[in-house]
Amino acid sequence: MKFTEALQFIKDFEIEGDLLEIGSDRGDGSTYIFATLAKNLDRKLFSVDVDNDVIDHNREEFDKLPFSLPVEFFNQTGEDFLDENKDLKFSIVLLDNFDWDWNPQSADPDPSIVAQQVKYREQFNLEMTNHQSQFTHLRQAMRLTDMLTDEAMIVCDDTYWAQEYGTYTGKCGAVIPYLEILGFSVVLNKDHGIVLVRKK
């Protein structure tokens, strides 16, 4: 999804917390977009990724900028970061880690997905399956429960409404109902991305 489209939903927000991105930029511009937003809001972006190569690349790209942005990178799982930083509060969260395999039964799988599955298994001891993706995102959402400000926005990438089944699926397919229990409402469902908002 185009992450800039989510920004329209915070115009009337009382931003009391920082920004969190679990799953740093892999070419979609998310970290730069949310770091710029953090600067405009006089807040800070915490960008978390388990892959040290991704973290190193993003640090290098941000170091090249002729100006500074309020972003701090963390090379760990989202769950570990949240467990170690329970004192933080977030008003804007992007959940976009643990990639989704759009065609897991294919006889000719995407080489990039296969390479990532091998890397995650060998380096991080993680089985990169769609079930594990939903499981991981739900665990992160549950840990975030007490770390979210009253007014908050959560962006779920690679997640969509499956009309034929009448339910959400993708990375955050299990997260959406949980967030609705917490008072969030879906305000955007577009291009395999979901935006949820909770207002006072």
Label each region the model flagged.
Residues 1-200:
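A short alpha-helical cap/connector motif
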